[in-house]
Amino acid sequence: MEDIHHKHTQSVSRSDMLRLLAVSRGDQPADLIIDNVFLLDLINGGTLPGPILISGDSIAGVGPAYAGTAALERIDAGGAIAVPGFIDAHLHIESSMMTPIAFESVTLPLGVTTIVCDPHEIVNVMGEKGLTWFLRCAEGAQQNQFIQISSCVPALAGTDINGAEFPLTAMLPYREHPHVLGLAEMMNFPGVIAGDEPTLDKLDAFRHLTLDGHSPMLSGKALNAYLAAGVENCHETLALEEGREKLALGMALMIREGSAARNLDTLAPLISEFNSPQCMLCTDDRNPWEIAHEGHIDALIRRLIQRHHIAPHVAYRVASWSAARHFGLKRLGLIAPGKKADIVLLDNLEQVAIRQVFAGGKAIDAQQLLRSAAMRQLASCPPQHNTLRRAPLSAEDLTLPLTQDADYRAIQLIPNELITPARTVRWLGDGFDTPDVCRIAVMERYGQQRVPALGLLHNSGLSKGALAATVSHDSHNIVVIGHHPAEMALAVNQLIDDGGGLCVVADGQVVVHLPLPIAGLMSSRSAAEIADIIDALKQACRNCGMTLNEPFIQMAFLSLPVIPSLKLTSLGLYDVDHFRFTEVRIPEESA
């Protein structure tokens, strides 16, 4: 069985090694020398003088000893500071609504030279076809695109209808792929803790690689048991003390700042010189509008330094070297001899002002990357068949019967959080006793034509209209919220016509919609085009009274039955805390 040293980026051929050594000794000219540059020392702090010598895709040497060394090409960095390329330790590319190729075209120029992706969104929809397409894209990328093999497809068996299953027998052949680093987030933490044998079989099969975790709010004996099984990290940490306990027990923290789940400000005080090797940065779910307006990993580094006063060498350490060490990627994460020449040149450390990005020793031309994206995307042969097999719906299909003076369970939405507590509301005949309650419905889209699951949502801010989407974790059925079933049906039927996507309806009309024809998750449009439509969608949501930063991303997590506490799947209202379905209406004897 191959180990991590045979993975992408981790080996150098003998001929390349001999050439690298000759350049290091000064016997042959470097392919490229970056002059007039300073290196941020991630190990000791401070900066070191250049130059940086590059041979092939590797760093041959650094420092004043190489002043005046011959090179085939020289670049004057103008006094810039060089830092290692950034690593996003956990994300779902599908959540950007871009293809892997379009994603690379906008994040690589922002210094993100390496990503570790879990493709469980597309695998839930179309199984291995989606995974093999992602791997094809990774093989042709300049960005180091690593894939974790999705561990929970479906997210939690028996709680939802999804488009595919991905059992261990199907997972095993992918372990040896050079772009696969391990097992993706093990969301079935109850199964791990209970010693469920099929779940433990998955951990055992990938134990020689990395075992990613998913353990929101897990503590005490349960957390100890989860870690004892071999799980190594978590990106779902929500509270400071929760993070402190996980670090103390040896768990690595992936500190997340996505478009909806924003945990960096809460967890940043944990980061210190001592524990920073156990802390990484990730985005999890971030859309192209946020990437265009705020940035990607660069935005997280900027916030750590400027808002939380983290020392620059520590901030850049958690953005690169920490993740490289965690995943066993020995040739990534530092600017040092023998490392892969993934380098970001900065005009300003605190502002993360990027001058130039190098991937494997090659300067990245952002415009050329964008221009070539469409052709490269076509060559990757993305799956094109329609995955939305649902007959149109009527207002009657989406009408939840309500009884006067009866109590109902509502899902409570919390801005910028994925947890959704249960809230009791009472129907008074002409409205609820609690303000800001709307209807929610989830319906499977894989051809079974099941009756929609109906429920109530509190604290969305929606005052009129309806929102619908086929981005709905993790099974990606159709989710819709609104006040009037007729408008909800209009939004859903628009998505059926589009083959999937996002839609806003107001005043009885479709205001704006974004078709997502690739698995109902992604568009073949450019990042800029998607960002413009997302901008229009966000404005339409604001016009409907919503103040959430990312209404569609928050809505996408209302169906995920592995994050507490109350969710609505295509099979009904699910109590995550007690692992069971429950009724929307609360019986009188228990009210």
Curated annotation (Swiss-Prot):
EC number: 3.5.4.2
CDD domains from the UniProt entry: AdeC
InterPro entries reported for this sequence: Adenine_deam, Adenine_deam_C, Amidohydro-rel, Metal-dep_hydrolase_composite, Metal_Hydrolase
Stored Gene3D superfamilies: Metal-dependent hydrolases, Urease, subunit C, domain 1
Pfam families: Adenine_deam_C, Amidohydro_1
Cofactor names: Mn(2+)
GO biological process: adenine catabolic process
GO MF annotations, alphabetized: adenine deaminase activity
Catalysis performed (reactions): adenine + H2O + H(+) = hypoxanthine + NH4(+)
Keywords, sorted A to Z: Hydrolase, Manganese
Subunit structure, as described in the record: Homodimer.
Family: Belongs to the metallo-dependent hydrolases superfamily. Adenine deaminase family.
NCBIfam families named in the record: ade, PRK10027.1
Annotated protein name in UniProt: Adenine deaminase
UniProt organism field: Edwardsiella ictaluri (strain 93-146)
